[in-house]
């Protein structure tokens, strides 16, 4: 029986062995009485050689007409050849065409196409080598996170997506009809994770989050994957240590397992190798001083947007923290700084090279009255948060947590020019199809 192999398994060590390959045509070139048919699958690309005197006139003519992305099965003998990808090729003896494609809508080099064309044909674009590489890196980052979290004693939980209230501001909620009332798509699992810490202490989840923001920047999506952690008995400094250790492990493990894919996007891996903790830490006050010294028009109390964060990242060659933000620009659930009531115990992790915030975290307010007052100050209805307030009535403890935007991390690791390429089917204010 002929052994079916993947493209990545075709190596010089298989010299003389008969194999079967199933995949899609990546490129097709006729040279005299031979056709060089490059076939790809999920693992790589293999050069196959179809000779007219071996397969016959009919099969040769059929092979000559195969366009990119035609699906085929070939059988043949492995031959070592240092000019071929992987150092070996397959001399074809049998070709089965599953479906012939005459013209594929995406150019052979997708970078020659407009972003809009690639997004219109996203269902086809994701099969191209670089798009596939992005998804492999993304899955590996998540796998690495799971490894680290399991080893460090964190429990994975599965919070709801349909919710009754806002976590990050009511203006960015997607509202939908829920039988005889209204519900919203979750902006964050945080509040539910906070409930889970009283039984499990250290919890995490990976869920989609939704933000109805009409932001048209290179780092915003309306739907994204959110890796969130919450822990009892931790203060802000404790949770920052967790963040840097987790991100460091995710990046280093992915470098170990997906170096080939990362090198499709990065010539220099120095910045990624520079993720050993501890990461630098600067206060919000120091950040304002740095920005003002560079001529940026920003005042104490202003939020740090993409432009300000980009300038700050020029000061660092690795991820870093900005901590101690003004209360007025942060969420209601963040704990007030006991040493300065103008501030909250919050920290953002920013990625270098202009990528900015990838994690937002804080110590949570654990006092019932203070949390209730913050909800009222924000103009929200305490009834929507009755259950959340209950957590401060029955054995409340100091606790902290954070959320990591998975696509933002992927975008930085691969130096992508836009976060949308880190999403399988990106959702933006202008894009809901396909």
UniProtKB/Swiss-Prot annotation:
Gene Ontology molecular function: asparagine-tRNA ligase activity; ATP binding; nucleic acid binding
UniProt-listed PROSITE patterns: AA_TRNA_LIGASE_II (PS50862)
Protein name in the entry: Asparagine--tRNA ligase
HAMAP family (alphabetical): Asn_tRNA_synth
Chief location of this protein within or outside the cell: cytoplasm
Subcellular location field: Cytoplasm
The keyword ATP-binding belongs to this UniProt entry's keyword annotation: yes
UniProt KW keywords: Aminoacyl-tRNA synthetase, ATP-binding, Cytoplasm, Ligase, Nucleotide-binding, Protein biosynthesis
GO biological process, one term: asparaginyl-tRNA aminoacylation
Catalytic activity: tRNA(Asn) + L-asparagine + ATP = L-asparaginyl-tRNA(Asn) + AMP + diphosphate + H(+)
GO cellular component: cytoplasm
UniProt EC number: 6.1.1.22
CDD domains per record: AsxRS_core (cd00776), PhAsnRS_like_N (cd04319)
InterPro entries (alphabetical): Aa-tRNA-synt_II, aa-tRNA-synth_II, aa-tRNA-synth_II/BPL/LPL, Asn-tRNA-ligase, Asp/Asn-tRNA-synth_IIb, NA-bd_OB-fold, NA-bd_OB_tRNA
Family label: Belongs to the class-II aminoacyl-tRNA synthetase family.
Pfam families found in the cross-reference section: tRNA-synt_2, tRNA_anti-codon
